[in-house]
Structures are given as C-alpha cells and as structure tokens.
C-alpha cells in the first residue's frame, strides 16, 4: 500500500486502490489514459487500453511490434475485444518496487503518448476507455488558446528583435 501512497498525488487523485479477497485492485491515471491492475500473492498485472480497432491493419501492427522492441518492461497486445493495450505482468518474487515503478511509468507514459498519435495517423482506430475524461468549457479553452498564442508571439518577437 505504501507503493501506491508514493505514486499518489493528493490534488489529482491519480491513484485509486482497494483490497478485496486477498487481491489489490488499482487504477492509475496518466494524462488521458487509465491503467488498471491487480496484485495478489503470486502476480502483478497491469494494463492500459490505447485504442480500439475493428479491422487489423499492417501499418499500426508493424508500428506496435517495432515499439515492443524498445520497451523494457511492458508490451503491446490485442485483447479479445480488439482493443490495443499495453500490458505488464510479473511474479511477486521478481517484482521489486524499482521494477514495478519503472514498469508502471513506461506503461502509462507510452499509453498516454501513443493513443493520440495512433488514432490521428490510422483512421480505423477509435478512442477507448475515456469515460474518466472531462471536456473543458469553451471559454476556458479560448483563454488557454489565447495565452499560448500570446506567449508564442512574445517569444517570436523577442527572437526577431535580437
């Protein structure tokens, strides 16, 4: 449980866990993605759904296979519902806190980064597991957009004036 306390951000409530029937069920939120996991006396399993597809395409499947070679702890997989997910599992005997931390970091950051990239590039992919996301009001989006534009213009003006 101390591991989850270490990961938890009190303001964001990014880690939720409960103990039930000798198992720990947990969710970790990173950006737009949610990783769910189960830990018991023998094994730890974590999964984050990245996107959903109705048809398999050689383009995105090759991209994911290539990515698998660069991952150290996790791997991309396709579940029975045609969800592309990134998974990690280990036996408790091999699961040091160091390994769990870096595996969870690798899994969540890759899921959060790649969902938008893959969905944008491959039109047959659809977003999945996004019910926890809250859309910002249009007024707030405008304020943030205008702020970014003003900062970019100020930076460009500063560069141009030397």
Q: Model segments located where?
A:
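Well-ordered alpha/beta subsegment
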Residues: 78-83, 87-102
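Generic alpha-helical secondary structure
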Residues: 1-4, 57-61, 100
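Charged interaction segments
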Residues: 90, 97-99, 117-125
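Charged, amphipathic alpha-helical linkers/stalks
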Residues: 119-162
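Generic N-terminal leader/targeting and pre-domain segments
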Residues: 1-8, 40, 79-84, 125-135
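N-terminal catalytic cores of peptidoglycan-degrading enzymes
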Residues: 1-53
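Short amphipathic C-terminal alpha-helix that caps PH/PH-like domains
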Residues: 100-115
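Short, internal acidic amphipathic alpha-helical interface segments
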Residues: 47-83
């Amino acid at each position: 449980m101390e591991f989850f306390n270490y990961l938890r951000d009190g303001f964001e409530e990014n880690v939720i866990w409960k103990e039930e029937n000798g198992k720990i069920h947990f969710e970790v939120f990173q950006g737009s993605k949610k990783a769910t996991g189960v830990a018991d006396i023998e094994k730890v399993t974590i999964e984050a759904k990245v996107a959903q597809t109705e048809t398999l395409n050689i383009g995105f499947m090759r991209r994911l296979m290539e990515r698998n070679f660069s991952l150290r702890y996790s791997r991309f997989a396709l579940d029975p519902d045609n969800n592309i997910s990134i998974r990690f599992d280990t036996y408790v005997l091999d699961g040091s806190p160091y390994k769990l931390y870096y595996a969870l970091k690798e899994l969540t950051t890759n899921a959060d980064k790649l969902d938008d990239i893959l969905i944008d590039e491959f039109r047959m992919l659809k977003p999945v597991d996004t019910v926890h996301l809250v859309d910002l009001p249009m007024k707030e989006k405008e304020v943030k957009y205008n702020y970014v534009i003003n900062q970019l213009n100020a930076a460009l003006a500063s560069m141009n004036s030397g």
